[in-house]
UniProtKB/Swiss-Prot annotation:
Gene from which this protein is expressed: phnX
Catalytic activity: phosphonoacetaldehyde + H2O = acetaldehyde + phosphate + H(+)
Cited Pfam families: Hydrolase
GO cellular component: cytosol
Protein name: Phosphonoacetaldehyde hydrolase
Active-site residues, Swiss-Prot/TrEMBL: 15, 56
One annotated GO molecular function: magnesium ion binding
Amino acid sequence: MNYSNPTQLQAAILDWAGTVVDFGSFAPTQIFVEAFAEFDVQVSIEEARGPMGMGKWDHIRTLCDVPEIAERYRKVFGRTPTDDDVTDIYNRFMPLQIEKIAVHSALIPGALDTLTGLRQDGLKIGSCSGYPKVVMDKVVELAAQNGYVADHVVATDETPNGRPWPAQALANVIALGIDDVAACVKVDDTVPGILEGRRAGMWTVALVCSGNALGLTWEGYQALSAEQLESERKRIHALFAGSRPHYLIDTINELPEVVADINRRLAKGEMPQAF
């Protein structure tokens, strides 16, 4: 039995917020702000976006390690946040997230048609998220009401490690019956999500405009001038540079062209780990 390179993609493994649903990735961001506020600690939207892509407990821990936020917490409680304090914030975050997730549950405009086309071309659609399963179940339910059902879903608490570790992406490979990680493309709007795909040995596509990095609504994105959009693209490309995505595109609606290019490269014998 001999090894041979895959010659075409078999699966796209997609993030959720900022990738397929919730243009601008507002659902988790706003709730982080509200959860900290319930402890009389101010966190801005921009600060809350910083660690996006991680599991939510890790996200809160990372925010609490930011010196400015830790100092605000110390002024209220007389100490910097411990892991138990992080858990207290997380336990307030969770019910708020479940309660308000529907507010930001709309599909990315055009995403459903794009994914339908990819499936017609033979791709399986896996997915994973920084949300825990109790939130993910609600996200999946709301997406199904809007016509989107992934072939597999992996929440951050269903594997030993969340992003940027590769476990969630690899859990999709196993569940979907994919025979080679190089036959998968991981699509995400965050650096931890791209690192997840890289470490899993997959092709990676970073989304520049639909997610956390740009942080605008669909209407805000559409209102940008050509000069503003180009400036934001340059800023966000630099943000992703260290995670080395194979491709950067504005939204998931450009993914079919990327898939076609990856298939061309695979047919030539190119592999994602080599680039």
